[in-house]
C-alpha cells in the first residue's frame, strides 16, 4: 500500500465526466495522497525555513458546473490561505504531476515579491535541465527553462512584476508513468530534491 504517490489510473480521475462524478473520483483516488503530502511537507518546510507552514488541499468549492482539470496541495505560512503569498505546490493535471514555487496574480505586494526572480535570474538559469517555468497556473503548459532565451525569461518575470494578471513559477513536471512515481520512497525523494532547489528562491 502506498501512502503518498499516485498510480497511472489515479490520473484517470480527470477523465470522469460531470462535476459531481469527477469530484467523487478525486476524493477517492487523489485527495487522500494530497492530504498525506500536505502533512509531510508542511513539516518539511517548517523545519527547513524556521517558519510555520500550513497545507491547503484544493476544495474546488466555487465550482457549480465545470469539473476541475487539475488539483493540488499548496503550502504557505498563512493558515487561512495561500494565494496571497509566495507558495509551493504539488499538483496534477490529467497528463502530468507538477511541483512549483512562485507567485500567483492574486498575491499581495506581487510586484515586490516577484522581484526575487529578477534578483536571482542567474540561479533560475542554472537550475537543472528538466526544470521549467509556469506563467499561468490554470494551464498545463510549462516550457523548459533551457528552451527559453534570456529575453524570454526576463520578459516573463517582468510580466509578473508589472501586469496585474501576470504570475511566475519555477516548476518541474513528470508523466503519470514516470519511475519516480513507482514508490513512496522514490516520489518523496523526487519532491524533496525539487523543493531543495526551490527553497533558495523562497528565502532570498
Swiss-Prot record:
Pfam families: DUF1054. InterPro entries: UPF0637, UPF0637_domain_sf. Belongs to the UPF0637 family. This is UPF0637 protein SAB0972c. It comes from Staphylococcus aureus (strain bovine RF122 / ET3-1). The lineage of its organism: Bacteria, Bacillati, Bacillota, Bacilli, Bacillales.
Amino acid at each position: 500500500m502506498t501512502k503518498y504517490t499516485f498510480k497511472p489510473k489515479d490520473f484517470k480521475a480527470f477523465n470522469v465526466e460531470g462535476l459531481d462524478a469527477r469530484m467523487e473520483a478525486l476524493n477517492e483516488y487523489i485527495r487522500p495522497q494530497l492530504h498525506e503530502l500536505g502533512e509531510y511537507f508542511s513539516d518539511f518546510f517548517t523545519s527547513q525555513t524556521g517558519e510555520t507552514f500550513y497545507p491547503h488541499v484544493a476544495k474546488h468549492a466555487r465550482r457549480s458546473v465545470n469539473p476541475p482539470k487539475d488539483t493540488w496541495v499548496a503550502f504557505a505560512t498563512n493558515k487561512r490561505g495561500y494565494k496571497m503569498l509566495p507558495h509551493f505546490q504539488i499538483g496534477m493535471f490529467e497528463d502530468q504531476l507538477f511541483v512549483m514555487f512562485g507567485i500567483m496574480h492574486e498575491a499581495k505586494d506581487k510586484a515586490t515579491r516577484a522581484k526575487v526572480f529578477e534578483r536571482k535570474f542567474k540561479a533560475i538559469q542554472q537550475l537543472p535541465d528538466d526544470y521549467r517555468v509556469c506563467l499561468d497556473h490554470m494551464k498545463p503548459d510549462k516550457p523548459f527553462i533551457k528552451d527559453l532565451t534570456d529575453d524570454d525569461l526576463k520578459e516573463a518575470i517582468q510580466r509578473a512584476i508589472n501586469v496585474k494578471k501576470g504570475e511566475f513559477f519555477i516548476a518541474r513536471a513528470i508523466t503519470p508513468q514516470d519511475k519516480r512515481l513507482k514508490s513512496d520512497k522514490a516520489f518523496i525523494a523526487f519532491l524533496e530534491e525539487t523543493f531543495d532547489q526551490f527553497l533558495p528562491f523562497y528565502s532570498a
